[in-house]
C-alpha cells in the first residue's frame, strides 16, 4: 500500500503522550515539503520534481514510509526534498545511541523533512536543511540548516545567518549563539581540520518544558529557510563562471561526501533503521572529484 502520510495507523503507534504534537509535526513537514518544492521549481525554468512514495510492508520490523522528491536541472543540478514518518524497533547496536531507546526496548518513532541541494553554478552555495521529531521513551525535536559555498559570499552568508537568527530569537535570547556554535562543531571534518561550509544552526534533543514552543521554533526555522535560500539562488544563479570554477566546485563536493558518509548522524540513522537508501543517500552529489 503506498504511503499517504499521517493516519490513524500512525497515531496508534505513537510512543509519546502528546499525540497531537506528533501528528501536527508530520503534517507540517509535508506542507513545508510542498512549498519548498514549488519555490525551487519557480527558479528552474524547465525542471519539475519527481515524486516517489515508499512504505514498509506489513510484518516488517519497521512500519510507515515517506516520499522522496528529486529534481535535476540547469540551476539545481540535484536537489532532494524528503519527508518520512516511520516507527518500529531499532537494531540492537543503536539502542545505546538513541536517548530513551533502551527504556523503550528499542521501540521508536520518527518523522521529519530532509533537504540537500547541489547547484550547477559554483557561485550558488549548496545547502542542507533538516527538521525532525523523534520519540522513544522520551520525545524531542532536532534539526538545523547550513550553507556550503564553493566561493563564500559575504552578502549571502549574512542573509542566511540573519534569517536563522530571527527564528532563534523568537525562541529564546541565547538560542542563536548556542545553535550556531553547535553547527560549527558538528559540520566539521576532523581528518582535514576544516569546516564543511560557512555554518548555520544545529540543534538536537530539543525538549523544553513547553513542547508547543519547541514546535513553534522548528516551524520558524522552516519558514526562515524558505524565505532566504530561494533569494540567494535567484541572486547568484546567472553569475558567469569558467571551467576552473566548476572544477573547484566538484572538489568542494568531495568534502561534502566525506562528511556525509563518515560523520553524518542522519546517514548513520538511515543505515541502522533499514530506511529507504535512496532517501538517506539523497545528500550525495551527482558529480564529484578529489
Where are the language model's segments positioned?
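Gly/Pro-rich turn-and-neighbor structural signature
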Residues: 17-99, 210-262
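A generic structural motif
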Residues: 21, 121, 137, 147-153, ...
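Internal mixed beta-strand/loop scaffold within catalytic domains of large alpha/beta enzymes
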Residues: 65-143
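Glycine-rich, often proline-containing surface loops adjacent to acidic residues and nearby aromatics
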Residues: 80, 109-111, 139-148, 194-209, ...
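Compact, glycine/acidic-enriched structural inserts
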Residues: 137-179
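Long, charged, mostly alpha-helical binding arms that flank functional sites
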Residues: 167-217, 232-234
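Long, contiguous binding/interaction regions
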Residues: 267-290
Amino acid at each position: 500500500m503506498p504511503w499517504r502520510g499521517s493516519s490513524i495507523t500512525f497515531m496508534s503507534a505513537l510512543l509519546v503522550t502528546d499525540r497531537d504534537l506528533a501528528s501536527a509535526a508530520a503534517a507540517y513537514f509535508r506542507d513545508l515539503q510542498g512549498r519548498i518544492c514549488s519555490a525551487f521549481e519557480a527558479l528552474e525554468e524547465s525542471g519539475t520534481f519527481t515524486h516517489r512514495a515508499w512504505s514498509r510492508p506489513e510484518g516488517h520490523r519497521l512500519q510507515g514510509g515517506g516520499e522522496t522528491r528529486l529534481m535535476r536541472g540547469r540551476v539545481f543540478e540535484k536537489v532532494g526534498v524528503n519527508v518520512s514518518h516511520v516507527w518500529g524497533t531499532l537494531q540492537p547496536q543503536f539502542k545505546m545511541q538513541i536517548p530513551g531507546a533502551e527504556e523503550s526496548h528499542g521501540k521508536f518513532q520518527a518523522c521529519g523533512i530532509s533537504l540537500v541541494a547541489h547547484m550547477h553554478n559554483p557561485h550558488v552555495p549548496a545547502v542542507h536543511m533538516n527538521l525532525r521529531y523523534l520519540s522513544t521513551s522520551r520525545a524531542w525535536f532536532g534539526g538545523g540548516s547550513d550553507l556550503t559555498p564553493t566561493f563564500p559570499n559575504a552578502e549571502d552568508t549574512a542573509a542566511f545567518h540573519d534569517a536563522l537568527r530571527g527564528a532563534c530569537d523568537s525562541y529564546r535570547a541565547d538560542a542563536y549563539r548556542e545553535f550556531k556554535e553547535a553547527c560549527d562543531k558538528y559540520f566539521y571534518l576532523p581528518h582535514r581540520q576544516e569546516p564543511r561550509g560557512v555554518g548555520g544552526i544545529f540543534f538536537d534533543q530539543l525538549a523544553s518544558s513547553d513542547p508547543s514552543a519547541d514546535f513553534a521554533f522548528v516551524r520558524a526555522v522552516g519558514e526562515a529557510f524558505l524565505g532566504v535560500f530561494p533569494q540567494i539562488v535567484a541572486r547568484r544563479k546567472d553569475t558567469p563562471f569558467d571551467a576552473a570554477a566548476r572544477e573547484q566546485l566538484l572538489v568542494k563536493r568531495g568534502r561534502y561526501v566525506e562528511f556525509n558518509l563518515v560523520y553524518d548522524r542522519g546517514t548513520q540513522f538511515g543505515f541502522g533503521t533499514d530506511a529507504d537508501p535512496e532517501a538517506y543517500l539523497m545528500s550525495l552529489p551527482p558529480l564529484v572529484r578529489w
